[in-house]
Amino acid sequence: MAKMFSFILVTTALVMGRGSSALENCLQEQARLRAQVYLLETRVKQQQVKISQLLHEKQVQLLDKGEENSVIDLGGKRQYADCSEIFNDGYKQSGFYKIKPLQSPAEFSVYCDMSDGGGWTVIQRRSDGSENFNRDWSDYENGFGNFVQKNGEYWLGNRNLHLLTTQGDYTLKIDLADFEKNSRYAQYKNFKVGDEKNSYDLHIGEYSGTAGDSLTGNFHPEVQWWASHQRMKFSTWDRDNDNYEGNCAKEDQSGWWFNRCHSANLNGFYHKGPYTAKTDNGIVWHTWHGWWYSLKSVVMKIRPNDFIPNIV
């Protein structure tokens, strides 16, 4: 009986030993497989990062080569409300991008100036007189011009300006240059454009800069009542909303926030060189060059008041 019991104990021990060994082998195999899966996942993530970097580098290379005839493709990862969001997402190359303001029904192309601290949405550009700015209400409402070349002239459109500037507080910066290779700028806090019902009226806040404050008429109290553009409705030759007995848009050949008529008109007729005019229908910024000098180039651009510039 004792021998039988002893045999059973030995047999049981052998079986248990084999089972324990099998379990240990199974656990080791599981650990090995988990390590392999983790290694594969890590490699996949590394490859995804490399692919993203290569795509971004390719975009930069295309721009550096001057291939500007297309909007920069960001891969459809997300929609951006303005150029500041694109900049903050890591895209630091100036060029045309697609944006979609919060209330906009669709995306549209715009030039993003990623210099000068970055994140600027360009709403207007004058550079060579290649575009006709003597347009009707519909053209100014919807926008027009060259949305392909980086120095192309365009107006982003009053509807788009309204959609952009009602989604937050924006700063307007105006870069000006004359034919003598001098440059100045004017900057306004809280730039806002009203809706269609209010004829896309202009609202601007505190001024700073080197070109003088031509938009509010503060340069001379006696002319402010007729020269200020503050709260003025937009006018075109076929939609006269100014305070003048005549039609400022017809006389000055452009659409603008005219009063009686202006101390600034950045959409005026492009004169290809310095001139002495009988009328003030050129690209005018009175506080820098007066009413009778037409500027060589203008860029109007906006970004949020609270944007933190890139100081590089």
UniProtKB/Swiss-Prot annotation:
SUPFAM superfamilies: Fibrinogen C-terminal domain-like. Its main location: secreted. Disulfide bonds join C83-C112, C248-C261. Keywords: Adaptive immunity, Coiled coil, Disulfide bond, Immunity, Secreted, Signal. Residues 1-22 form the signal peptide. It comes from the Eukaryota. Homodimer. Interacts (via the Fibrinogen C-terminal domain) with LAG3 (via Ig-like domains 1 and 2). Immune suppressive molecule that inhibits antigen-specific T-cell activation by acting as a major ligand of LAG3. Responsible for LAG3 T-cell inhibitory function. Binds LAG3 independently from MHC class II (MHC-II). Secreted by, and promotes growth of, hepatocytes. This is Fibrinogen-like protein 1. The lineage of its organism: Eukaryota, Metazoa, Chordata, Craniata, Vertebrata.
